[in-house]
Amino acid sequence: MKLTPREKDKLLIFTAALLAERRRARGLKLNYPEAIAFITAALMEAARDGKTVAEVMHYGTTLLTRDDVMDGVPEMIPDIQVEATFPDGTKLVTVHHPIP
């Protein structure tokens, strides 16, 4: 299977997000990379599902709370940017303060 660097990045994000999902389901608090992967993958899937950029940006602030992550993680993530594939093309999505 031949994948572009972008496709490899997407698979890596998905794999890390799947691990984060499983750990969260077991009641573990997510660390920095897990929180980033969890939110990023959810944003990419929301875009793929046909949500608008504004809807995806808002959705990104509802995925995790401070109780879901280790101490200090929310302060380490002032914003998340991801290039997501929407029905009308690829767009840059920025979510400010994704963990309120």
From Swiss-Prot:
Pfam families: Urease_gamma. GO terms for molecular function: nickel cation binding; urease activity. It catalyses: urea + 2 H2O + H(+) = hydrogencarbonate + 2 NH4(+). It is an enzyme of class 3 (hydrolase). It comes from the Bacteria. Its EC number is 3.5.1.5. Its main location: cytoplasm. The keyword Magnesium does not apply. It is found in: Cytoplasm. Belongs to the urease gamma subunit family. This is Urease subunit gamma.
